[in-house]
Regions:
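Generic beta-sheet signal
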Residues: 50, 77, 111-113, 150
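Conserved TIR/SEFIR loop-to-helix hotspot centered on a Trp-containing motif
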Residues: 55-60, 80-104
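Hydrophobic anchor at the start of a short beta-strand
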Residues: 47, 106-108, 147
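Conserved N-terminal substructure of TIR/SEFIR domains
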Residues: 2-77, 102-104
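Short acidic, S/G/P-rich loop/turn micro-motifs used as interaction or catalytic elements
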Residues: 27-29, 55, 81-84, 116-118
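A short helix->loop->beta-strand "cap" motif at the edges of active sites that frequently abuts
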Residues: 103-116
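A general structural detector for well-ordered alpha-helical segments in enzyme core domains, enriched
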Residues: 36, 64, 94-97, 133, ...
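C-terminal interaction surface of TIR/SEFIR-family domains
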Residues: 1-14, 114-169
Length: 169
């Protein structure tokens, strides 16, 4: 079996419906992640993401995938960077997390930065291959999950809470 299949064929562990795993690139979307964290906390939901995982002693990818398995819902927030690539699979960590969440049967809620949003050059994928992969990933999220666009931090937080109001008890 391939590296990706190895990650998604194991049976999912018991999940907590009030735990939400938030996946995105870090440098360009840290303020957006913080706004989601605050909104979830105000609703009594637990935010799980790379912030708490990076400090664990095990391999970050394995830790991340374990946290996704325990979450009740997976949220993808995608801007204009494909992000760091996992050497074992060739996928960005955000896309790898998405593939794992789908493989585990998690509800997926996806948000994409609107094309009208102004971004700094540092927030863009500089490599052509990364940008093409980003566009393909965005298309997958739109097609398979009806991804919703956002224009800024506050807009994203509102739309996340609206979407979760329909899917989290």
């Amino acid at each position: 079996r391939g590296a990706i299949e190895e990650l998604i064929v194991s049976p999912p562990p018991a999940s907590d419906p009030r735990t939400v795993f938030v996946s995105s690139t870090w440098n360009d979307l840290s303020a957006h992640r913080a706004s989601i964290r605050e909104a979830l906390s105000a609703r009594g939901l637990e935010f799980v993401g790379m912030e708490g995982i990076l400090t664990t002693p095990s391999i970050p990818r394995d830790s991340t995938l374990a946290y996704i398995g325990r979450a009740g819902t997976y949220i993808a927030v995608v801007g204009w960077r494909y992000g760091s690539v996992d050497q074992a699979t060739g996928l960005s960590f955000t896309e790898l997390e998405y593939v794992h969440a789908v493989g585990q049967g998690k509800p997926v809620v996806a948000f994409l930065a609107d094309e009208s949003v102004a971004v700094r050059p540092s927030e863009l994928d500089a490599e052509q291959d990364g940008f093409q992969r980003l566009l393909a990933f965005r298309e997958t999220l739109s097609r398979r999950h009806g991804a919703v666009t956002f224009t800024d931090v506050a807009d994203l937080a509102r739309k996340v809470m609206r979407a979760l109001g329909q899917s989290v008890p």
